[in-house]
A protein has these predicted regions:
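Coupling and communication elements adjacent to P-loop NTPase active sites across diverse families
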Residues: 2-85, 89-92, 223
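ABC ATP-binding cassette signature C-motif
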Residues: 1, 57-247
Length: 247
């Protein structure tokens, strides 16, 4: 029994190390896991104190065949052509990762698709059965107010019951008095967890995520990865996390 626990712990640590050691923002956590692996002894196995959020995106409506049609989108910013005659179509079972070095192009495309920016030319059309939830790369404006976490999330929920709303916050490890904290004083990681709560409570069947793993710890990244894999709708996302892109 003890040996089995040891083997499970070693495997868990090895998975964390292999996944995150190459990621600069998480390399410290990976190094500490490495030390734990080196020190591990048979009698040192204790229950893990790490907590994983529970990320589960459940669409309120099944998506139809026609999801998104993009025709000739073009956008120039400060004299630089960011999008040039972009054309593509998405169908009901597509999960699309936007990769590459031009982060501004990805963010610009997402902003246009979410109605936050106008293209210079071209058009796009969402399918009639679609509803979208958006995770922006820069969420500063979302939290520039005096609302508490509970009140902030309630404004995005069709059901205004506080217990219902707190349930979504609880999934993202906001407990008890956390709900009365003002959103404008939250850390980067807490804001990301709020945004993911907002996406879950929306019941959208299309998720658009622009670098969602920024500011997240390894446990939260793992939970997000699992939530994205289980999501039955359409995904459009940009991420530097190779594991999320591959899976």
């Amino acid at each position: 029994e003890a040996n089995k626990k040891k083997e499970e712990k070693i495997k868990e640590l090895q998975e964390f190390i292999s996944r995150f050691s190459a990621n600069a923002s998480n390399s410290k956590q990976a190094t500490s896991r490495k030390r734990a692996l080196e020190k591990i002894q048979l009698d040192e196995i204790r229950p893990s104190s790490r907590k994983y959020p529970y990320i589960d995106f459940r669409p309120n409506r099944e998506i139809g065949n026609e999801v998104l049609s993009v025709e000739g989108l073009t956008k120039t910013i400060d004299g630089v052509k960011i999008l040039d005659n972009l054309t593509f179509t998405l169908n009901h079972d597509d999960k699309v990762a936007f990769v590459g070095g031009n982060e501004l192009a990805k963010t610009t495309l997402f902003k246009i698709l979410m109605g936050e920016m106008e293209p210079d030319s071209g058009s796009f059309k969402w399918g009639i059965t679609t509803s979208q939830a958006y995770f922006p790369k820069d969420s500063t404006e979302e939290f520039n107010n005096d609302l508490t976490i509970v009140d902030w999330l309630t404004q995005f929920s069709e059901i205004k019951d506080m217990t219902y709303v707190r349930g979504f916050l609880g999934r993202m490890l906001f407990a008890g008095d956390d709900g009365v904290k003002k959103v404008k004083v939250l850390s980067g990681g807490e804001k990301v967890r709020c945004l993911l709560s907002k996406m879950m409570i929306s019941g959208a069947n299309v998720l658009v995520l622009d670098e969602p793993t920024n500011h997240l710890d390894m446990e939260s990244i793992t939970a997000l990865n699992n939530g994205m894999m289980k999501f039955p709708g359409v995904l459009l996302f940009a991420s530097h996390d190779h594991q999320i892109v591959q899976t």
